[in-house]
């Protein structure tokens, strides 16, 4: 009887859900960057070039997932597939990493990218 009780205690203790504090300001900033790119690519809304490039840089460096967008003399995606792959990667990253997305994490990611 004692063994079963101990096994149940260990089982229930190991099933605790992990809670985190989500920094809504940073999550909203991340989503705003995605929405800016989405506005330009899906809705053909004119966006400021610097804002577009800043959003690409932010998302790429914070997530560690490089963009397939062009940003030399012209900017944007060569095709819809590249755009969709980037969006899926960045949105997937956000869903998996909301707990670690803090101001210090973002600042660190951006400072190592632009020393």
Whereabouts are the PLM-identified features?
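Sec-dependent signal peptide recognition
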Residues: 1-8
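Alpha-solenoid helical-repeat scaffolds
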Residues: 20-30, 42-53, 77-80, 84
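Residue-level detector of alpha-helical secondary structure
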Residues: 27, 31, 38, 87, ...
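Post-signal-peptide N-terminal segment of Sec-exported extracytoplasmic proteins
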Residues: 33-66
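Compact alpha-helical subdomains of small soluble proteins
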Residues: 55-115
């Amino acid at each position: 009887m004692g063994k079963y009780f101990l096994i149940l205690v260990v089982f229930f203790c190991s099933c605790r859900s992990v809670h985190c504090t989500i920094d809504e300001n940073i999550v909203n900033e991340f989503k705003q960057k995605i929405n800016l790119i989405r506005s330009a690519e899906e809705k053909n809304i004119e966006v400021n070039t610097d804002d577009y490039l800043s959003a690409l840089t932010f998302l790429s460096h914070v997530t560690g997932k490089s963009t397939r967008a062009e940003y030399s003399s012209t900017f944007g995606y060569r095709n819809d597939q590249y755009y969709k792959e980037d969006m899926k990667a960045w949105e997937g990253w956000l869903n998996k990493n909301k707990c670690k997305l803090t101001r210090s994490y973002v600042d660190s990611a951006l400072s190592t990218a632009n020393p």
